[in-house]
Structure formats: C-alpha cells, structure tokens
Amino acid sequence: MHRSTTALVLCLAPMAISATHSASAGPDLATRLQVHGFASQAAVHTSENRWLGDSPDTSTEFTELGVNASLRLSPRLLVSGQILSRRAGDMYDGAPALDYGLADLKLLYSDAYRLGLRLGRLKNPLGLYNETRDMPFTRPGIFLPQAVYFDKVRNLVLSSDGVMAYGELYRGFGSLAFDLVAGRPLIDDNVEWAYLNQDFAGDLDIDGVSWLGGIWYSSLAERFKLGLSWADLRLAFDPDAGAPFTIGPGQTDILYWIASFQYNAEDWTLSAEYAREPIEWR
C-alpha cells in the first residue's frame, strides 16, 4: 500500500527587538538586553501515516511561536529564557510553556578557552539539532529525522531542570568542547505511551538524577564538526493501588547516544547522525 506525506511550512524570520532605555535605566541597557522571536505555520498532507495523531488527509495543526530574551548582568553572568507555544496534531495543544530559563556563569575565559556553569531549565545538548529543534530556520528540513529526534518523546529529551558544566578549548587545528548535565528531564503522557505502550493507572517519573553530555570537535571556521552525545536516565513506574488492568512497579533504563557529523560548504551543508537507544525494563 502506498503511503505518502507532503508538508509545507511558512516561516517568519527571527525578529530582533532592541531594548529602549532611559537615563535612569543606564546608557548600556540596549547592549545588554536582547529580545527575539520566531513563528512558523505548516500544512501537512498525508495518506495513512497519522502524523502526530489522527491526520489522514490535510492538517494545519502545526504551529510554533517563541519569544526569548537575555540580559547580561555582568561580563561573567547572563540570564536568559524562552516561552514557547507549540501546536502539533493531537500531541501538543499550543499552551505556552517555559522552554528554557537559566543563569549562565563564566568561571574562566580567555582567547584560548572558556569554562562555565549553567543553572535552571536547560536545553539538552544532544545531537546537532536538539537545542534548536523548535526554531524552523535551524532545521535541515520541515521536520527533523524521526529516527534520531523522535517527536513522540520530545519533552523527555528536549530540556532538563538541573546544572550544566561546559567548556571549550581553542587551538590552531580547531576547537574541542564538552557539555555535562545533571538534572531531571521533563515527563508527559506521550512518554508513557511511547515506552509502556499505554497510559496505565499510575505514575511514570524520572528516578534519581539523569546524566547527559557530549564531546565535540570543530575545525577552523566550523567547516567540519564531529560529536558524540549521550543521555543516561531511568524511568520508574508506580501503579495505583488496587487499579485493574495495570502493570506492576518497575523501571526502564535508557542509554541514548548520538554520533554526529557535519560538513559546511559555502552554499550547502551535509549532516549525518547515527543514534542508538538500548532500553531495559525490570
């Protein structure tokens, strides 16, 4: 049986709003405060794929709106955040939510290196596109490859509440960078359907601290980029007492990793990623 999906997206380019200031606000507020936004609207025609819900024909329920701001409080400290509204079929209803909100502290920095900490709701540094996956003009296509960036569990891999250590070393051959996150990713009903195949009576939540990280190499001018990123987390299910038709308590261990490659030419980019996600239920 022939199945097909056709998509069209209308993207509004990034909007930048300069901060106005008065004498009492300080003459440099406009250089320290930045506000940006983006918007996109897609139309999807599919035969029988049921893309993100019951959409067998044509659907326009694919809208993304984002507003973000950052304020540099000092040469070492930056605070930033983003509110995102995302409508995607039956899975996301467009309710505004905090996408990220963090404080970024530079511990050490020079022309040769930088080392810092981020605290708050963090975008998980997984693969080439996870941190910017909701900005349509950063994606390689209308939708990201679902083998690597599975939208059904998007919230689980998108961001975490926790702390991140990051660093970068600049040399004549390019740069080496690392990220290490300790925190708690976000859980929603879509995650339970994806890993347990049903919305059972009970609670599915993150068990303990989850660890995420990545190491990256970029050549001069970022012509080549190579990276390996990973997430190690555990989901625990606690069934409701006396509930019929449920499963017993248990844990799902997930080790998710992505190998990434990118080549940037003047007029085109070649990207390739390979992902594995071994899962163990016990």
Question: What kind of region is each of these model predictions?
Answer:
Residues 19-32, 50-51, 192:
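Cleaved targeting-peptide boundary
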Residues 90, 106-117, 153-282:
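Signature for the C-terminal beta-barrel architecture of outer-membrane proteins
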